[in-house]
Amino acid sequence: MLVSVIIPTLERPQLLLRAIGSVLRQTHRELDIIVVVDRPDPETASAVQSVGDARVRLVLNPHPSTAAAARNAGADHASGEWLAFLDDDDEWLPNKLERQLAFASVRRPALVSCLSRIVTPTATYTWPQVIYDNSSPIDEYLFDRRALFRGTGMIQSSSFLLPRWLFDKVRFNVESAHDDWEFVLRLSKQAGARIETVPEILVILYVEEQRPTYTTRTWSWSRSLKWLESIRPILTRRAFSGICLGVVGSRAAQEGCYRAFPALLYRAFRYGSPRRWHVLHFLTYWLTPRAFRRQLRGLLRIQGPNPA
């Protein structure tokens, strides 16, 4: 069973080689690896060539813009009946694809995810804390905050494995400010796909706050708000509040845009149904220093995943 692995990259050949190496070490050997670049990049081309494996191909994205466009371009060149995605600064554990394919064989149609080991400059932990079980809307799982300093749900593109035909129903929105989230939301709520999670750590995500990244571009709070309004028809009121006060609100606070404070509170209550945690988190972002929030997150972090 051929799996096409799509890796968008941008002038980071050493990180890319780590990512490619983790794919080539997979116990599932039927692989098609597509590295996508936005523009001619001799160093990346040289790195790919140095791998010396015919399964690794370099593709130039004909419509360069975002990681979403690069992922779509990679899918257009894919030969596999299954697609998987990997950011160039992340890596997989060797049995990632084997375990997900086995899981998918009895849970179709589905996007199959897994647990991740998150590595930051100051800590290492497992995420998500709560495994999605399809008993609640996917948007509430991702955004309906049930704790003050950190949500408990996550589905990230480096963990994705799904059938090619299912990907073609949705594809990534190249105009989206949050394309990973939107892809999962539309896959579940519009295409009717299940989201399944292998309850094992199979991906390592490296989060380095000062490192520029191609696949996790940071948008302004106003761009995130426009995105939220564009997907409001498919969101529950609870999820709308969570995104408005959590995602958009935290970005506005980081930007110091004080006029956003009343506007976002109004929208959250007008179009959503906020929990107390949504409001407390929103206020905390505006009223407490970032270093203090980090310390508390570390103290309150729950160890180990649980069912949703």
Question: Can you annotate each of these PLM segments?
Answer:
Residues N61-A78:
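Glycine-rich, basic loop-to-helix element that forms the pyrophosphate-binding segment
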Residues D53, A69, L97-L166, R217:
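Flexible acidic/His/Gly-enriched loops in nucleotide-sugar-dependent glycosyltransferase catalytic domains
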Residues G21-E30:
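Short, acidic, metal-binding catalytic loop of nucleotide-sugar glycosyltransferases
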Residues D41-S50, E91, N95:
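Acidic helix N-cap motif at the loop->helix transition within catalytic regions
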Residues Q26, D41-E43, A253-A308:
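Membrane-interface aromatic/basic loop that binds lipid-linked glycans or pyrophosphate carriers
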Residues I201-E209, T213-I243, R259-Y271:
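Catalytic core of nucleotide-sugar-dependent glycosyltransferases
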Residues S136-S220:
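Conserved nucleotide-sugar donor-binding catalytic segment
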